[in-house]
């Protein structure tokens, strides 16, 4: 049975401390910051912002921290008080999800998140969209006047994802989205990127 994460967010019950505990101490602090002319040049980055998810069975908004290094992703959701509600660590072939003090493991992070929480979120493509890039099978449907992507369609089983890049900003020397809306039948995800920092990887 999926975990009621909206209930968890409201009551903040039995949430364990985790590796990703919010903005006061982040994984990105272990790396030197880097300026890039294009976001795709960054092999590692960290993001701080907010995420709001609305589905037929759930609705919530919370803080988001995301650390990306190559094919590895580590993200956490925290309340306004800094309490960690959910953490998800993934690398090829292995994903670990912590919520309500329990750990769940699967080979695919997207399948794991949906099985535990009931959320259908396109995690595989999010690192690309967050940095303003396009997936292999994505089709750009509109551009802003300045030439930056305004919207795209991403093929998916049952219903395609409609991705809207509502606004853009300059971070770490590159143009990256400020606000993104991702939606398909019955599901809407909004991400606000307050800080995106490119990081220098260790040689």
UniProtKB/Swiss-Prot annotation:
GO biological process, one term: lipoprotein localization to outer membrane
InterPro entries, A to Z: LolA/LolB/LppX, OM_lipoprot_LolB
Signal peptide interval: 1-22
One Pfam assignment: LolB
Disulfide bridge map: none
Membrane topology listed for this record: Lipid-anchor
Keyword terms: Cell outer membrane, Chaperone, Lipoprotein, Membrane, Palmitate, Protein transport, Signal, Transport
Gene Ontology CC: one annotated term: cell outer membrane
Lipidation (N-palmitoyl cysteine): 23
Subcellular localization, as worded in the UniProt entry: Cell outer membrane
Covalently attached lipid (S-diacylglycerol cysteine), positions: 23
Family annotation (HAMAP family): LolB (MF_00233)
NCBIfam families (UniProt xref): lolB (TIGR00548)
Stated role: Plays a critical role in the incorporation of lipoproteins in the outer membrane after they are released by the LolA protein.
Oligomer status and interactors: Monomer.
Family as reported in the entry's similarity comment: Belongs to the LolB family.
Protein name according to UniProt: Outer-membrane lipoprotein LolB
Organism: Shewanella denitrificans (strain OS217 / ATCC BAA-1090 / DSM 15013)
Lineage of the species this protein comes from: Bacteria, Pseudomonadati, Pseudomonadota, Gammaproteobacteria, Alteromonadales
């Amino acid at each position: 049975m999926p975990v009621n994460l909206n209930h968890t967010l409201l009551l903040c019950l039995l949430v364990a401390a985790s590796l990703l505990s919010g903005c006061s101490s982040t994984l990105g602090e272990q790396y030197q910051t880097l300026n890039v002319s294009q976001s795709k040049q960054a092999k590692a980055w960290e993001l701080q912002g907010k995420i709001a998810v609305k589905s037929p069975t759930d609705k919530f908004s919370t803080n988001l921290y995301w650390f990306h290094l190559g094919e590895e992703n580590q993200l956490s959701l925290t309340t306004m008080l800094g309490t960690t509600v959910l953490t998800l660590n993934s690398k090829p072939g292995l994903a670990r999800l912590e919520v309500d003090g329990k750990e769940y493991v699967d080979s695919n992070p997207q399948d794991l998140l949906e099985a535990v929480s009931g959320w259908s979120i396109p995690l595989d493509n999010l690192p690309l969209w967050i940095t303003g890039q396009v997936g292999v099978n994505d089709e750009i449907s509109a551009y802003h006047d300045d030439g930056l992507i305004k919207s795209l369609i991403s093929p998916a089983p049952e219903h395609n994802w409609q991705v809207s890049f509502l606004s853009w900003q300059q971070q770490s020397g590159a143009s990256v989205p400020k606000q993104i809306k991702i939606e398909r039948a019955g599901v809407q995800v909004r991400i606000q990127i307050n800080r995106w920092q490119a990081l220098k990887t260790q040689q």
